[in-house]
Regions:
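N-terminal helix-turn-helix
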Residues: 1-76
Length: 77
């Protein structure tokens, strides 16, 4: 099966946020990505509502779109 690198990277970034808000540098380290790539991924995911920047902070956390997707799991299983 072929790999889609951008999807793998997006999931790595999302996984880096599962323990709470973190900054770009920590996301990059946890996801094993260059800092510039992590920053671009976070910006793209933020536009989609999958992550959000903590108000008054430079850290990111999982966003409302992820919460909405997760809440649908209970009714579909």
């Amino acid at each position: 099966m072929s790999r889609v690198q951008s999807i793998e990277r997006a999931f790595a970034v999302l996984s880096a946020l599962t323990d709470g808000p973190v900054g770009v540098t920590d996301v990059a380290e946890r996801a094993d990505l260059p800092k510039s790539t992590a920053a671009r991924m976070l910006a793209s995911l933020a536009r989609e509502g999958a992550v959000e920047q903590v108000p008054g902070d430079t850290r990111y956390r999982l966003g409302p779109r992820i919460e909405a997707l997760a809440s649908g799991l209970g009714s579909s299983r």
